[in-house]
């Protein structure tokens, strides 16, 4: 997916300004070049607080005012973890998946609203048995397999009856 970086500011002149405003995940921005439209979207939530003049500048979690937006269509794949004695294989059937935009969430149950977010193991600086990381591997048909930890040396493994939701842009 193509990546653009935006600096987003909002000016609110009211005396009853909010202390915080948020830019939701999947907020879309459209541009056009040579009469061709391109739609980009955020992949996470960003927030902004006002300065003394009521100007809000959205920032990333590391404080940068450059907000990344990605071109593409979000696709979601849901898996349910079987008995842990069974081999667990999670293949996302999408040959156009942008692996840099993957978000992996593991829910306790099929109806649970709380989840752990798993991150790519390549971003880990330290791995313990409780680390929530995944690995990604392209399989021969061009799809991608998501591989979780083993519960010891490569991090936490999802448990039986967990629900796994993987979304990414394509």
Say what each PLM segment does.
Residues 1-170:
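Signature of Asx- and small-polar-rich beta-strand/turn repeats characteristic
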């Amino acid at each position: 997916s193509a990546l653009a970086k935006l600096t987003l500011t909002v000016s609110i002149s009211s005396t009853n300004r909010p202390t915080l405003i948020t830019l939701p995940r999947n907020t879309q921005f459209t541009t056009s070049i040579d009469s061709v439209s391109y739609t980009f979207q955020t992949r996470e939530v960003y927030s902004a607080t006002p300065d003394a003049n009521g100007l809000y500048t959205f920032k990333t979690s590391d404080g940068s005012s450059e907000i990344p937006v990605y071109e593409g269509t979000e696709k979601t794949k849901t898996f349910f973890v079987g008995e842990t004695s069974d081999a667990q294989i999670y293949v996302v059937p999408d040959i156009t998946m942008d692996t840099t935009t993957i978000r992996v969430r593991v829910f306790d149950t099929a109806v649970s609203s709380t989840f752990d977010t798993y991150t790519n193991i390549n971003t880990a600086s330290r791995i313990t048995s409780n680390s929530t990381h995944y690995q990604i591997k392209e399989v021969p048909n061009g799809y991608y397999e998501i591989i979780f930890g083993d519960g010891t040396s490569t991090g936490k493994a999802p448990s039986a009856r967990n629900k796994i939701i993987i979304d990414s842009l394509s």
